[in-house]
């Protein structure tokens, strides 16, 4: 059995800016927490990309003062978004419970691999909000001054020049060997 993990844990702290972070917890342990906040106040959560495959992407205890939370991606591949003084199943539930995160999303980040902070998720690109004093990403690359990316990495997604809409021919079941497709 895998042990539980917490990406970011803040306990009893004041005046904390949690901005432009990426957390990717790949274990399916149901006790994992991507971003855990307990006690304290004047906390600002902006432009974070928090993804888990088990547990909660976000866990906020009661009595905590969060001044701002927005432009985040809270994603759980196998369950609820998290907990905000009570279980929140969806991003809409989180917005209703917190009164915050109206510009946040809950999208799979499409990391290049389990140990990568680099994402291929178009929804993260240019959908953050500028934060005064933060002009570069984790790699030292310049952040977009008006519309930075959500998460630790500023990136430009690859453009799609083609995609599969439908497979018309050959019909299933496929015969063995090489077949032309239409």
PLM feature segments, named:
Residues 29, 54-55, 73-81, 100-101, ...:
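Acidic glycine-/aspartate-rich tracts in secreted/extracellular proteins
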Residues 157-182:
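Extracellular/luminal regions of secreted and cell-surface proteins that mediate adhesion/ECM remodeling
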Residues 1-2, 7-9, 14-27, 42-53, ...:
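Right-handed parallel beta-helix
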Residues 31-33, 39-42:
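Extracellular beta-strand/loop-rich repeat segments of large surface/secreted proteins
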Residues 4, 31, 107, 160-163:
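Cysteine-rich, disulfide-stabilized extracellular repeat modules
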Residues 11-12, 39, 60-63:
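Short, T/G/N/S-enriched strand-turn elements that build extracellular solenoid repeat scaffolds
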Residues 1-7, 27-34, 54-61, 78-86, ...:
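Short glycine/acidic-rich loop motifs that flank beta-strands on beta-rich extracellular proteins
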Residues 91-154:
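C-terminal accessory segments
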């Amino acid at each position: 059995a895998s042990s539980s993990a917490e990406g970011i844990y803040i306990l009893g702290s004041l005046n904390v800016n949690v901005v432009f972070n990426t957390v990717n917890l790949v274990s399916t342990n149901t006790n994992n927490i991507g971003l855990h906040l307990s006690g304290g106040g004047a906390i600002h959560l902006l432009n974070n990309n928090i993804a888990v495959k088990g547990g909660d992407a976000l866990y906020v205890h009661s009595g905590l003062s969060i001044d701002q939370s927005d432009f985040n991606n809270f994603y759980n591949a196998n369950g609820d978004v998290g907990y905000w003084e009570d279980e929140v199943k969806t991003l809409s539930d989180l917005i209703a419970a917190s009164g915050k995160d109206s510009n946040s999303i809950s999208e799979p980040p499409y990391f290049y691999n389990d140990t990568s902070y680099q994402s291929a998720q178009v929804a993260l690109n240019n959908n953050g909000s500028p934060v005064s004093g933060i002009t570069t990403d984790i790699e030292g690359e310049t952040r977009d001054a008006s519309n930075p990316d959500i998460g630790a990495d500023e990136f430009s997604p690859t453009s799609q020049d083609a995609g599969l809409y439908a497979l018309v021919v050959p019909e299933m079941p496929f015969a063995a060997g090489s077949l032309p497709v239409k």
